[in-house]
Structure formats: C-alpha cells, structure tokens
Amino acid sequence: MKIVGIDPGISGAISVLRDGNISMVVDMPTMAEGTKSKKQINAAELTNILTKENISHEDKVILESVSAMPGQGVTGMFSFGQSFGVIKGVCAALKLPVILVRPVKWKKHFNLLNSEKDASRTKVIETYPYISSELSKKKDANKADAILIAKYYFETLGK
C-alpha cells in the first residue's frame, strides 16, 4: 500500500511513502490564476502526479485538515479553502480514499507541537538522510510536512 501525504495550499507539497520509505516528494503544482500574479493549484498536474505514481483506491491519501487561522483574513482563507477543495475534488475523481488528519495530531506524534516550521525539515532529514538534497532549503519545510503527514498514518494507522 502506498500512502500519499498532502500539505494543502498553494505552497504545500505532496509525498508518497511505499512501505514506510519516501518514494517521491514534490511541491504542490500551481498555475497562474487569470491575469493576476496570484496562483492556484493546477488540478490537471496534481492528477498527473497521482496517476504517474500509480496511486489507486487501494492506497490512502492523508490530507492535512486545517481550519481558519487567526489573522489570515477572509481572502486568504477563501483561497486556502479553494485549494483544499481542488485537492479533495481530484482525489474524488480518481476514486482515492481521503483521510483527514489535524495538524495537532501528527505534530504531537513527532513532538513538533509549538516548534519552528523548520523543525519538521530537520526531523525528516534525521529519519531519512537520503532525502536531504530534496529538503535543502527552508522553503522545503512544506515537503517535510507532507512526508510527516504520510509517516504519521503509516506509524499509527496504516500498519
């Protein structure tokens, strides 16, 4: 069974674990939204990624379930909600089972509650040194989050 971990949002990421090992991690595919400099999730490319990885209804998609955050603003939350909906829609179209996990659950499992965003990147590099080149920049913390979301399911529910 493959486990897909998704950190949703425009700056999010997608990871795939096979037997507990990372087989793929990429930034969330995006595209321009109209003529503005804003971005949106590229649903077609997300579909391509999941299809190329041979993700099927026998696998699991673990999607971080987030809610409104103080100070984010209405426009930002609406945009985030759209991104979340696109991800769920792609998974539904591909008939992939989606399991939602709250950030507090997976972060607590890895002792990352109230830690810096970059702590997840450090944790993944310690656990999977072979992936360090994929996580060399601070912005790669979202990739690390996607990996840990999948790993959380693997360690707690997916065995």
Positions of predicted regions on the chain:
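Phosphate- and other anionic-substrate recognition elements at nucleic-acid/protein interfaces
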Residues: M1-K159
